[in-house]
A protein has these predicted regions:
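A cross-family kinase active-site recognition segment
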Residues: 2-9, 110, 115, 127-188, ...
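ATP/Mg2+ or Mg2+-diphosphate-binding catalytic cores
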Residues: 20, 259-261, 267, 288-328
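Active-site acidic catalytic loop and adjacent metal/ATP-binding pocket
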Residues: 51-64, 71-72, 196-243
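A conserved alpha-helical element in kinase catalytic cores
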Residues: 70-112, 130-146, 252
Length: 328
């Protein structure tokens, strides 16, 4: 593995805070609005929809008549079944996260009458801007290391999927991407090796830490005290404790940071074998190459651009680490 100076950042990116197509508070059925007010113990007098993310579920910050604020997510099982299921899973996971994990606390949940509704602690924070600054990277990576420690082993009370359960099929995306012409020309000579690295990574990335797996800037809030909060705990799996840190470093590399230098600076990543890091990149690269070429869903017209950005970031970092030719 070789390291080199940082790249220029990838310039094409999704618009911040404007990627989701969500229902507003007024568009929720009246019975759901009444449920939320009743469970919160006060009328909702103001609602601010969250424009970030790539899912179509309701997600809004609500101001109550008594001055309190809550964050509420909701999805109906008839038209948004996969998202209702993910909210149900998130409620179960939030309920058992230890206090040491900086996640908004679950206040209550409702799972009946065709709707899954979650009310959570409202965090007065902002998303870290992109491109990443070094200061924000340090805050987030510090918080991820602390969370990994607090979540090893995973807390009892939930059946946590293994890494292979959720990621075991991803190596197959390399053949699918090659068959559909989605592999960039500079990577075509390395398709077989990338497929092998991806397959090997499923075992290397297994572990006994409950990992968030979806640590993007729109799932992070930083408050006035520089406390980092991780949101959207839908897709947690048991994995290697460094997995979430690698996800953030991948985005940092795409923003022009020297991710290999950052690997060496962090206690949780500095001793990782090259095969694990390269396998991580190959695994996500094959998946993102394939998904970026799929038709855009009506739930988020920006999803494929987002996935294409991550494919380019993973391809660049993997090529640099293995001294392969990079795209011009």
């Amino acid at each position: 593995m070789t390291t080199s100076a940082a790249l220029a950042p990838i310039s094409v990116r999704v618009p911040p805070g404007a990627t989701a197509c969500r229902p507003t508070w007024d568009e929720l059925p009246a019975e759901v609005r009444r449920l939320v007010s009743r469970r919160c113990g006060a009328e909702v007098i103001e609602a601010t929809s969250i424009g970030s993310g790539f899912t179509p579920g309701f997600a809004s910050r609500l101001l109550l008549a008594d001055g309190r604020r809550v964050f509420v997510k909701a999805a109906d099982e008839q038209t948004r079944a996969p998202f209702a299921a993910s909210y149900r899973a998130e409620a179960a996971k939030l309920a058992v996260l230890p206090q040491a994990v900086p996640a908004p606390r679950l206040l209550w949940s409702h799972d009946a009458d065709g709707w899954v509704v979650l009310a959570m602690q409202d965090v007065a924070g902002t998303q870290p801007p992109r491109p990443w600054t070094q200061a924000h990277l340090d805050l987030v990576l510090d918080a991820l290391e602390a969370s990994a420690h607090a979540l090893t082993p995973p807390p009892p009370g939930v059946q946590w999927p293994s890494f292979a359960d959720d990621y075991g099929d991803l190596p197959g995306y390399w053949s699918a991407s090659a068959d559909t012409g989605r592999v960039p020309a500079e990577l075509l000579p390395y398709v077989d090796r990338c497929s092998e690295l991806a397959a090997e990574s499923v075992g290397l990335l297994a572990g006994s830490t409950a990992c968030h797996t979806d640590v993007r800037e729109d799932n992070i809030l930083i408050d006035a005290d520089d406390t980092v909060w991780f949101c959207d705990w839908n897709w947690v799996v048991r994995a290697h404790p460094a997995f979430d840190s690698l996800v953030v470093l991948l985005s940092a590399h795409g923003d022009g940071h020297d991710a290999d230098a950052l690997l060496e600076r962090r206690a949780i990543t500095r001793a990782l074998p090259d095969g694990l890091v390269d396998g991580f990149l190959a695994l996500l690269l094959g998946y993102f190459l394939h998904q970026a070429g799929e038709p855009a869903p009506d739930t988020s017209p920006w999803l494929r651009l987002h996935q294409g950005w991550y494919a380019e970031a993973a391809g660049r970092w993997l090529a640099r680490r293995r001294s392969w030719p990079e795209a011009a």
